[in-house]
Amino acid sequence: MKETHRFLIPDYFPQFACKMGACRAACCEGWPVSVSMADYFSLLGLDCAPALRARLDCGIHVVDNPTKEAYARFEPRYDGNCPMRLPDGRCALHAELGEDVLPHVCRLYPRGVRAEDGRFECSCANSCEAVLEMFLDRAEPITFLERELELKLPPLPQRRSVFETLGLAQKIRLHLIAIVQNRRLPLPQRLICLGGLMDRLDCALKNRDKALLEQILAEDPSELCPKLAEPEVGAEHLQFGLQIIEQMMEILDEGSQSIRDCGKAALAYFHGGKSGDIARYEAANAHFSAVFPQWETFFEHMLVNHMFFAQFPFQDRPESMHEEFVALCAVYAILRFLALGCMADRRDAEGLIDDMAAAFRLVDHTEFDRYASRLLKRLGCASSQEICDLIAL
């Protein structure tokens, strides 16, 4: 049954539409699709053609430790696609029986619905190429507005991790987004500002100091940042950052089907010289900046959309504010590394979109935020200067 609520949404949301069969890569490509117990038994009872029944019976399996929310899943085929995907790109379930029979996740994704304290939000994940295509040539910052929406909502899970926010979680999140949208500074410096602000917010929240918290949130982001951002970035810093992200990508590439192709392409480019080859980095950076002069605005939109979709820094996982900040820096570094390495001898916008969407399939469909800061620490990238080196790329 459809419900009507007032949602906070990004301004692009009303224009979003799934490309269906026209999608070059499905937003679930390379990953299993988890469905609830209710959806699983609903699929078992469908009255459908024998060919679709065979697809369902072979494609969906109960997981080893099922729960009501994650009871079974569609395992990807050898080519990374969902077993329900037809040769023309459409979903076999949707094509034969319509939208209403789809599991909740398939019907909504890449849309994500969030509800806390009576507030509803809805946005789209960056793992969808149609979302990123709206961002590539967009000049104006993403804004957020309230809109009444009628949606058939899934059962919304209870939070496993509860953070002290003094009732200001949404206001904190939007203030952090405003820091990333401060175009008076280059994007890496905005991230440095973000880290400094998050340290102050963390202190206020731990001390339950609501007056200090409200004072911080009342500050103008464009006035705050110049006081915080004074990074030291020379050739040796760039070389260190490049070496760290190369090592990180080698590890991620081994375990991620979604970024394997673009990860290998980027690593092959940078490994054409010695590890941390600044000359190859500078050549790729110059080429990328010339082909996509608006790249920084595009990256801003991707980070902002990711932060809103994931409820940064209050994702439902037991991570500290600092670890969430480091994870966001890791996301930025991965995007830059893939963009520069994969596009070093290319000029096609579709290729850039596909590589960025693949990166977000890794970020959105895994516990990336939980292991990113630990992985960087293991690789020797933990101090404030080392994080600055990482995002200077």
Feature-to-residue mapping (PLM):
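Flexible, acidic/Gly-rich N-terminal and inter-domain linker regions that tether
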Residues: 1, 6, 14, 37-38, ...
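Low-complexity, highly charged intrinsically disordered N-terminal segments
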Residues: 26, 30-59
